[in-house]
Amino acid sequence: MELDINGARIFFTLPIDLPVLGQLKISETMIVSWIVMILITGLCIWLTHDLKEKNISKRQAVAELLVEQANKFVIGNMGEKFRYMIPFVAALFATSVVSNLISLVGLRSPTSDLSTEAAWAVVVFIMITAQKIKTSGFGGYLKGFTQPIPVMTPFNILSELATPVSMACRHFGNILSGVVINGLIYGALAVASSALLGLIPGLVGDVLSQIPVLDVGVPAILSVYFDWFSGIMQAFIFCMLTVMYIANAAEEG
């Protein structure tokens, strides 16, 4: 049994040569990411259409529940002064969940490409740094690298840079491991199905051995964890780390 896992396909390259970055390539990750954003935007428009103060619909009740949970999550972990973070955290969670689960319809998950999580982590890192500078001032931020003693400066710098790296790799590693495990399971079940059905004598056995019967049903059960549970859990963990890092940055001052 061979397992071949390739990266995102490059569909076409734009005739644009950007400084440092080089040619602009349109990959499968970019296209699916746009599909994810369109789906989320469409869902938000549908949920918030024709809102009422009384006799609300089930659709509006769901929308209000989602907003209420987002408010509780951010304010409960960061405090009232970070209310402005609610739209960002909600958008980050929704994008991560839909990106993780979109593989269920046959599309390649954008989160199985490290560049996706890396981009999210860089944005979060910039917000963390901005909060530290806002709290302590630029001089205080730089001085923090020399604490508790100046000799610790290189280690503090590495620790600071490790934050976005660890956030990106944690999310990416868990999603990629699910892809690899699912691929191994599909391959193993196909081999087992061929071996078992091949025991049937005659033409019937020859025909049935070419059909991966065991691939039907069993992977669907396993996807409840690897796709649904793990996908939602990783999105929650990434958002939790985001709010905790930013909240801690405000307290350091």
Model-inferred region functions:
Residues 1-253:
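Selective transmembrane helix interface/packing segments
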